[in-house]
Amino acid sequence: MQHFKIITAIFALSSSLVFSQNYKTSSTAKSEQGFPKVDTNGKAVFQVYFPEAKSVVLEGGDGMQNLKTEIAKRDNGFWKITTSALEIGFHYYWFNVDGKRTNDPNTELYFGYGQPTSGIEIPSGEDFFSDKNVKHGKIVDDSLDSNVTHGKRNFKVYLPPNYESKKFPVLYLYHGTGEDITGWEKQGYIKNILDNLFADKKATEMIVVMDYGVALSPEQEKLPDDYPRTVVSTKNLDKIVVQELMPYIEKKYKTNGQKAIAGLSRGSYQAMYIGSNHPELFSAIGSFSPVIYEGTELQPFKELPIDKLLKSKQKPFFFLGIGEKEDKRFFGYNDLLTTFLSQNKYPYSQYKSAGTYHEWLTWRRCLYEFAPKLFK
């Protein structure tokens, strides 16, 4: 009997060591939490305490579809969920606990899908967004009172490592639907990406303004859901950027007058709208996972003044980026844009992110490709 106990103890210790060697705690886990864990093949293990639950199901965003999971409830009230290999990159996720959407208490929360949401990072083997031993910039919070939306608007500003030494160009950068101004900082790792690019002399140092992508007045907030709210919001945003935000930034921060604009998903539409409407103000327009709103088959650019680019003297450089595994509708928007630009011999570049979905690894890579092309 004693011999059996020793063998059992050795087996348990051995299993623990194998588990710890093959799996590492996700970078999104809270400090001192051991889960979720990810192995070298992208398989994940979640352990959550829902003692009264009868059903716990793992759910998530684009990169977590079609997952195979093994779910087991233990006598101590913990549920263990093991998955098949996940796609690389950052994924939003949550648990369906007896029909109720519930975040993982083990992870940091990220604003996605219109609410605080759990996240997991599946390593891609890249380090361009890692926190390296380089000179660091900083991100500050700021705000202004808008006469367009009749309220306070918050935004974040990235200041480059050598901010105190001279004046800098400015990139205005937008998040996507269901996200907010924290997206580029938390999920996007913008600070690490730019710090590393600047340290390697691969991009011109710049200020980045991460503005809020919703711009509706209190009255417009009451518009029905089937109303083209995004177009209304974008037209308001156009006024805010040109009449309020830019003058504010140029007065308060050390800017040199050069500007570019970019965004992801809905933010791509906003960047294209504002950039196309004011081509004289921007040297480049970046569209990451492009979206076009309220277009028709005959008039795909009905609510996007992209034809103004053709008449402009400055002709801002146009950048398009998309994930290889994104939904076909995003490729449809992308193709409409590349066809238009090619037919009109307008300068642009196309980037495709290998193996990624409509998610943050795509957009991190887009920024990494886009930033070195700016302010040359």
Predicted regions mapped to residue ranges:
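Short beta-strand segments of immunoglobulin-like
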Residues: 33-38
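Bacterial Sec-dependent N-terminal signal peptides
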Residues: 1-22
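Non-catalytic cap/lid and distal C-terminal segments of serine-dependent acyl enzymes
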Residues: 23-26, 39-68, 73-376
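A general sequence property marking short-to-moderate contiguous segments
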Residues: 20-32
